[in-house]
Amino acid sequence: NLYYAPDPSSQIACSIGGNVAENAGGVHCLKYGLTVHNLLKIEVQTLDGEALTLGSDALDSPGFDLLALFTGSEGMLGVTTEVTVKLLPKQPVARVLLASFDSVEKAGLAVGNIIANGIIPGGLEMMDNLSIRAAEDFIHAGYPVDAEAILLCELDGVESDVQEDCERVN
């Protein structure tokens, strides 16, 4: 099972060309990178009509990184016409931890503490109370609406590593 790691919040309506133009990320970008980190090659049409191939089928290519320059240029350098992406193997285990906080500041400090302890979550999202209530009104996920902030921390990998990381985060 392979998958494309970037998962922008607009994924239900966005296109891969738009992801390249904006260098889209999503909640998994901390561990798996932005669009630019998950591209091998793109074909573009420059503003003067020249067709270019940037990048290669290999993970690394010599010379200037024109692929990175073009990615995120919001169409100012040209239009993406074809994209070759890097696919990753799906992790065998993924668990999501929910932590609630009485302040946004404490939630932010928790993010720093998680990373400072060498844990790189597969996904990490913080929501303030306004966002919690809006999401809860819409999807009824069971978020604590009295919390000032929550963290959703997704830990992924092999079972033993995920279990250890869950214990360390708790």
Annotate each PLM feature:
Residues N1-N170:
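Noncatalytic alpha-helical scaffold of FAD-dependent oxidoreductases
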